């Protein structure tokens, strides 16, 4: 079943809208390089569209009615938005779910050290990365430093033109004969992913008898005190993430693609957010949940396994229909969801791992995966045929370009998403997302046409699904 390349179908007006969506998308990628930054950005955009914090509604004893727009935040790393419909919650919601964490390198809690007059930050990588891809790149440092006095300092170094950047070094080719014989998984080891952050000793009084032994480290500590009013001990309560420095860029002479960090899964997260904020009226309550920790198993308080979403739905049921555990269960069971996560784009350079008839292609629209998992569909959510038919109808109703695919050839590999977690409530769930080249690399590639079709598809799902 061949699908048209969406680029061949657009009018001048649609091409203008496509570029508008992609410009906003690139701006969001630049502003949201961590899960915290994504939540901050989502809250700003939601407030601008009239969304209110559910905590304020509860505190003020207000009731919630059709048309109301609410959001709830969990620990500044996960957010759920709700646009209340005319039908009761017990008839189910139309849910868009994506994750906003991406593979990266994290700074450890006791990280700062000096070695032969180089200052480093000790690190531990997060998520599935090819470690060798992260060396010799300009890197930025993002995150927060929580201090004992209760204040939190925001950190972002390496994104402005006049900012310094950081780097993880690699062995020169002239001395790398043994290194080049290693397997790709071990050619760069995890303990060698430490971040080079300085080499200049602190200025010292030459008349002093006892001089600073680790003068480069001392200089870094001095600079941290100067710029962030932090002590070395404050690393203990810091969350600092190392990400590629630089902005999202148009890719290709024809500017048909986007090259950027973190498009898994922010391409689905931001297009879901755009769709959610653009919807005017809904019958079934619309929900957009953007979660943390998917890349490491959706665990913890801010991952999809958390009770945060269930608890928030319980609060909404209480605010609309009165407290009832049974009504909460009905609201969840009767819901419909798009688990919005990226798909592997067919790459002609690595054609041997793909089965073309079941592959996702650039420019052919939103990708649906009936199932994910590995080997014999292990760990998969396998969507029902009846639900797939409804999905097709919703997409066709708004002329969305879409395709169905799997993740590579059978037995070659596999992957998972948050779909199976939400399916545990008994709701209908299918994986849907955007095809990505170089997935999990520091810089990933998407098609602008697919970004636009994802936005259209997510909006159609909210408006058309019954």
Which residues fall in each region the model found?
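N-terminal hydrophobic/helix-forming segments and targeting peptides
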Residues: 1-466
């Amino acid at each position: 079943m061949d699908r048209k390349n969406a680029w061949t179908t657009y009018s001048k007006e649609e091409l203008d809208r496509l570029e508008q969506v992609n410009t906003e998308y690139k701006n969001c990628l630049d502003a949201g390089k961590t899960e915290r930054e994504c939540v901050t950005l989502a809250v700003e955009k939601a407030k601008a569209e009239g969304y209110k914090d559910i905590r304020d509604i509860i505190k003020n004893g207000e009731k919630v009615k059709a048309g109301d727009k609410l959001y709830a935040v969990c620990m500044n790393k996960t957010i759920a938005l709700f646009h209340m419909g005319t039908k009761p919650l017990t008839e189910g919601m139309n849910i868009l779910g994506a994750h906003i964490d991406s593979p990266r390198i994290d700074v450890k809690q006791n990280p700062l050290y000096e070695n032969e007059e180089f200052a480093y930050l000790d690190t531990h990588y997060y998520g599935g990365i090819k470690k060798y891809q992260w060396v010799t790149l300009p890197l930025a440092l993002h995150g927060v430093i929580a201090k004992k006095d209760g204040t939190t300092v925001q950190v972002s170094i390496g994104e402005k033109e006049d900012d310094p950047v950081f780097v993880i070094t690699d062995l020169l080719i002239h001395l790398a004969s043994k290194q080049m014989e290693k397997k790709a998984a071990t050619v760069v080891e995890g303990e060698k992913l430490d971040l080079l952050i300085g080499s200049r000793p602190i200025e010292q009084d030459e008349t002093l008898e006892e001089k600073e032994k680790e003068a480069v480290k001392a200089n870094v500590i001095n600079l941290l005190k100067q710029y962030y009013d932090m002590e070395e001990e404050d690393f203990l309560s810091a969350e600092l993430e190392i990400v590629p420095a630089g902005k999202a860029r148009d890719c290709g002479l024809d500017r048909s693609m986007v090259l950027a960090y973190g498009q898994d899964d922010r391409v689905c997260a931001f297009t879901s957010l755009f769709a959610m904020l653009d919807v005017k009226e809904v019958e079934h309550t619309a929900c957009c949940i953007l979660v943390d920790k998917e890349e490491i198993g959706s665990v913890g308080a801010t991952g999809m396994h958390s009770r945060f979403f269930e608890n928030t739905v319980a609060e909404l049921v209480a605010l609309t229909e009165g407290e009832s555990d049974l009504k909460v269960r009905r609201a969840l069971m009767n819901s419909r969801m798009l688990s919005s996560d990226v798909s592997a784009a067919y790459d002609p350079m690595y054609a041997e791992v793909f089965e073309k008839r079941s592959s996702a292609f650039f420019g052919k629209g939103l990708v649906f995966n009936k199932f994910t998992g590995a080997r014999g569909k292990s760990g998969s959510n396998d969507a029902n045929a009846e639900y797939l038919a409804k999905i097709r109808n919703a997409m066709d109703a708004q002329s969305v370009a879409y395709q169905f695919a799997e993740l590579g050839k059978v037995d070659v590999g596999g992957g998972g998403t948050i779909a199976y977690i939400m399916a545990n409530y008994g709701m209908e769930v299918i994986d849907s997302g955007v095809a990505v080249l170089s997935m999990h690399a520091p810089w990933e590639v998407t098609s602008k046409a697919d970004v636009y079709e994802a936005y259209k598809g997510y909006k159609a799902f909210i408006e058309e699904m019954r």
